[in-house]
Amino acid sequence: MDYILRILPNMFAGLGVSAQIFLITIVLSLPIGILLALVRISKVAVFRKLAEIYIYVMRGTPLMLQIMFIYYGLPLMLNVQISDFLAAILAFVANYAAYFAEIFRGGIQSIPKGQYEGAKVLGFTYRQTMWHIVLPQVVKRVIPPLGNETITLLKDTSLVYILAMNDLMRVTRAFVQRDFDTMPFLVAAVFYLVCTAILTKILTYVEKRYAVYEE
């Protein structure tokens, strides 16, 4: 118990780094995902194809590879310096925006075409139809799959240890290697499980709230 109490401050600090990456990724990737989804169903073939290729590449390659490419590859190609934190954010946002885009695309395409036609008769523009009629319904429908991806994101933040960032996973590995003790792994597991439980509760609450409004 004394050992756990000694490592807890560092573990909490590592959790803070992981939480920053998680929150920033959510805040940025959700709106980008919506925009990508709209481009993906656009009537402009060039834009639609570009969005399709982007989503295919992001979903078809490992997130770890994307992190390493942005951190090591982009500086060589563009002759710029990228911090480990910025590289992690860019990689996570680029990756999860693609996944969110496909979720939103499926939600948008599930809306009956009659609603678009009805909105047009009422004088709504395409933008107004999307904003006031389609997207509010889409949000209700995509909460479960978005929740699943959000929980996956929480666990994926552990991948940033390859950038030598002091996230929860790297701090844990450092203690294990230094002290030859596996207890930090158990503590880290508890941290992730508690965070996942809290996130699941929040998502369940949001889903129920939308269900009430739907009724």
Which residues make up each language-model segment?
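Transmembrane alpha-helices and adjacent helix-loop boundaries
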Residues: M1-E215
